[in-house]
Amino acid sequence: MTLANKTLTILIALFPLALFAQEEKDSAGITFSGSIESNIHIPKYDEAIETEHYDDWAMTNTYANFDMESRYVDAGARFEFLKHPLPGYEEGFRGWGVPYYYIKGKMKCAELTLGTFYEQFGSGLTLRSYEERSLGIDNSILGARLVLNPLKGMIIKALTGKQRRYWGHSDALLTGVDAQQTFPLTRSLDDNHPSLTLGASYVNIHHPSQETLEGEKLKRNVNLFSLRSTLNIAPVTLYAEYAHKSNDPSATNGYQGGSGKAYIFSAKYEKDNFSLLLRTKRTENLLARSERTQTGLAARVNFMPSFSEFYADYDLSSSFPAPQPESEQAYQAKMTYNFPEGTMLGGKYGTSLTLNFSHARSLHKDEGGTYYQDISAIIDKKINEAFSLKFLYINQIYNATVLDDGDEKVHNNIFITDATYEFNERLSLNADLEYLTSTYYEGDWLYGKLSLTVSPHWTFSVSDEWNCGETKTHYWYGEVEFSAGSHELSVGYGRVSEAYICVDGLCRLDPSMKGLFVSYNYEF
């Protein structure tokens, strides 16, 4: 019997506990909740933008979550249908079933979960198990997790299980423990009072088979540990973390092996109208997987946070500054100042200014140099009661040799104007105009979008993305969005250009597409 079957059998056996809890409704307070998310694409071939030919007349990523909560017992499951997945997702995710299910027992100072769960230790340098549907990431753990709160300010976590890999699970067994203690520097543990938080984590990856490389046996156990601390003395917050990984030859590091390490330092100042963030990190051979031969986004045990700024609301600002866990030194400095109302620069309604500098490079001068650099300025200004403006300038450098399949360093300049006019409480119009100058082979791009919102239910938008450099191709698109209560529905038709979708420093490539796009979300 597989681990999944064993766990499912246990859940079925324990589920009557949840039903029994209904008899204690007055004291237990049972609640049911869930959600449905369905994204559908009906493709149409377009030779002009080189869309792919698909065997499926329609493709969808559909998810349905069901959860029950009570005073002592929680339970839930998620159904997924990706038998015909959306373009750009890894082929391994093709399938359907119930990969996520759990039952959780809760007491005053303890919590035990059996089944599937997500977890993160610290910033994720030793363990980050999470779901990111836009990228096709789900590295949940099937097994058991215990969370203890024995003392005020103390959290202890212990877990064991196997990591999800597409529709199965990796052979390696993960075992980990994390401990964190917050010490008040005054008599209060309130978030606004000075405090010192110390944490430590340990993760073991046990590979059951004795793999060999060039005749040499690889060690079955890979160990990761980290130490971290947070000092909070308002308005200053300081954070530091160090992580270490034992010898781990894998496809990620070219089976070179050797130990890995990383550190993160950050300092944040935030008071009144001013905030400043300074941080740096260094990573070397730290990425660990539950399958040594795996590449791509699957079977990742830990996580390398990105120190690059993301401008997710804007079309032409997307790039792919994915952290390089084998060799990277990164820095970021970000400042925000809100000019007060009634001042010369603040005007009647105030003005916000944000400046950012991000830089990531190789640890070795002969291995790629600069990976990515971002210098940006954002001005957000409300002109009057009805009209507001936002201006962005972004200067980017990215190394296409390292981050993409190119062979050059690409220089981008991006200019964005975002304007919103509110005619009344129900009707508003948003205009987004973007221009990208680039040394990339396709050259410059121009993007424009108009969105009319009729509150509380409707939004109508039209856009065009035009390659005014090499191809002269237009990517026009129209969309209608409707929302009512817990329901959200959007229907769009048109062309979508090839682009990288990035979240938290991890990316996947979305191919050029044309056709009908439908998205539906419901929460209950």
Feature roles, as predicted:
Residues 1-31, 524:
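Bacterial Sec-dependent N-terminal signal peptides
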Residues 63:
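Catalytic domains of carbohydrate-active enzymes, especially glycoside hydrolases
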Residues 100:
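Phosphate/ribose-recognition catalytic cores of enzymes acting on nucleotide-derived substrates
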